[in-house]
Amino acid sequence: MKEKLIIKNFGPIESIDLDLGKITVLIGEQASGKSTVAKVLAICRYFSYIVNDSSIVNENYESEFVATALRDWGLNGYEKNDSYINYINSDYSVEIISEKVEINKEFSFYSFIPKIKPKSDSFRDLLKSLYEIKPRAEENSNIEVIWGIPHSFLMTDVKSVMDNPFYFPTERGLQSIFSLGKSSIPNLSDSLFNQFAKLDQIARNFKNEVEIEPLNLIYKNQNGEGYFKIKGQNEFYKLSQGASGFKTSIPIILGIKYYNSLKRRSKTFIVEEPEQNLFPTAQKKLVEFLVGSINSSNNNFLIPTHSPYILTSLENLMYAHKIANGNNGELKEKVNEIIDEKYWINQEDVCVYYLGDGTHKDILQRDEALIDKDYIDSVSKSINSEYDQLLDLDVAMQN
């Protein structure tokens, strides 16, 4: 089954009900709720929050894990009376309801009542194992414990069933200054700063040369410093002195390559604005890289974006799949000559939503495997209209 995420009365979101595919794209203007959706999904997929509160399965009482998670991800203050979040996947569901608690006329706060329901046998077995091991860990000071859960349990039992998503924030280009400390990046939440720490560590693992296909680059890390060169050339340059597009895109590619190399289970990646500082051709190649990762490693992606090139590139990959698999596959070889088969994707694995005015609209036209880009093209129409009006004035003056 597809994942589902429902959010109501939370931050800029009034009411959305999203099916999530292997790749889900969110478009919309600034402050439309794209990042809110991305961070809520991250919270609901984070096993440290979910498994640590396994004691609330099918129960209804206040829990601190929601408040902690919102604070960690910079979403505290987004809650409202009757805020509602419901996340469902094949293993478990998480339902969260907020209630306003008024102490007196001058002071009130929101309490959160979560409910977690197992859906798969593997998740039920996971919770059963946790019930058995957690009391022993709490009694034995020699066992390394994270949030009350033994570290060994997180690294083996939990990861065999579920895995944390990896979040690439818009600030990812700043990961090189991670060592300066969190205070060097104002207004950055703890969890996003932790992503910088992971990116920094991942980058250090690539001591040998690795190809960055979408940018036609070669990357390597020496003594904690990133270096790159143009493929086919000899001289390396410091990444810190490279183009902005390199700084924002290389972390994405390294992170995905790293987790693919582990060959464990599929991974969910949340990539905010992958188009940052990239020429349209590079955006196209990056989309191909992401879809190729889905096909080779069964990964999942959530992509908040503003770029029409991201949408058009994804549309072409869906259309290629549709044509190649129609008419008994007669056109498969010819389609492969245009777009490599490893980048094709079934439209059934894709979801595209426009967010605005607190709600959403599904803009994927599945009959034709096309994305309704009127929501972006309307801006072009407005710009063209202004140009036409200016042109009319100019022509009138010439006459």
Language model features with spans:
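Phosphate-coordinating catalytic segments in nucleotide- and nucleic-acid-processing enzymes
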Residues: 47-269, 341-399
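Switch/communication elements of ASCE P-loop NTPase nucleotide-binding domains
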Residues: 1-52, 227-383
